[in-house]
């Protein structure tokens, strides 16, 4: 079972709630899920896992490096599996939809700006807020 190995590799004990939450994150077409969305998906699949447990598991996953937490406009947190590849986000301010993108020109400019300021960049995040085509 792949989920079990991922949990072991992250130093986490294998529990049914952890496996189920990890499966929801892996199977979701939407790569950015709130704790509430994970909870709803668990309920829809007939799993008896409480919302507090979902929050706790997601926090443990974040600490173990399995997921990244993003706090977008509006103050809600969403989680995505850590894929190891950097990307930035387009965020719809009306519906909350999040779209990932990679732009090498933007990446190069950010590095150049940091170097020009003699700043050792360790990480960065770019979130562009606007209105998606479906909400326009």
From Swiss-Prot:
Lineage top rank: taxon: Bacteria
Protein name stated in the entry: Ferric uptake regulation protein
Subunit annotation: Homodimer.
Biological processes per GO annotation: negative regulation of DNA-templated transcription; negative regulation of siderophore biosynthetic process
Subcellular location: Cytoplasm
GO cellular component, one term: cytosol
Residue ranges, annotated region (DNA-binding): 1-83
PANTHER family: FERRIC UPTAKE REGULATION PROTEIN, ZINC UPTAKE REGULATION PROTEIN
Molecular function via GO: DNA-binding transcription factor activity; transcription cis-regulatory region binding; zinc ion binding
Family of the protein in this entry: Belongs to the Fur family.
CDD domains the record matches: Fur_like
Binding site for Zn(2+): 32, 80, 89, 92, 95, 100
Functional description taken from the UniProt entry: Acts as a global negative controlling element, employing Fe(2+) as a cofactor to bind the operator of the repressed genes.
Coiled coil start-end: none
Pfam family membership, one: FUR
Keywords noted in UniProt: Cytoplasm, DNA-binding, Iron, Metal-binding, Repressor, Transcription, Transcription regulation, Zinc
Protein residues bound to Fe cation: 86, 88, 107, 124
Spans annotated as Dimerization: 84-136
């Amino acid at each position: 079972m792949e989920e079990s190995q991922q949990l072991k590799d992250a130093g986490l004990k294998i529990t049914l709630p952890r496996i189920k939450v990890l499966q929801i994150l892996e199977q979701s077409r939407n790569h950015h899920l709130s704790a509430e969305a994970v909870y709803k998906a668990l309920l829809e699949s007939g799993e008896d896992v409480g919302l507090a447990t979902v929050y706790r598991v997601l926090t443990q996953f974040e600490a173990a490096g399995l997921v990244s937490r993003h706090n977008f406009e509006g103050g809600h947190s969403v989680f995505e599996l850590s894929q190891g590849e950097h990307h930035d986000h387009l965020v719809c301010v009306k519906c909350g939809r999040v779209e990932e993108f990679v732009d090498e020109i933007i990446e190069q400019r950010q590095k150049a700006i940091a170097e020009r300021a003699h700043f050792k960049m360790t990480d960065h995040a770019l979130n562009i807020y606007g209105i998606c085509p479906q909400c326009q």
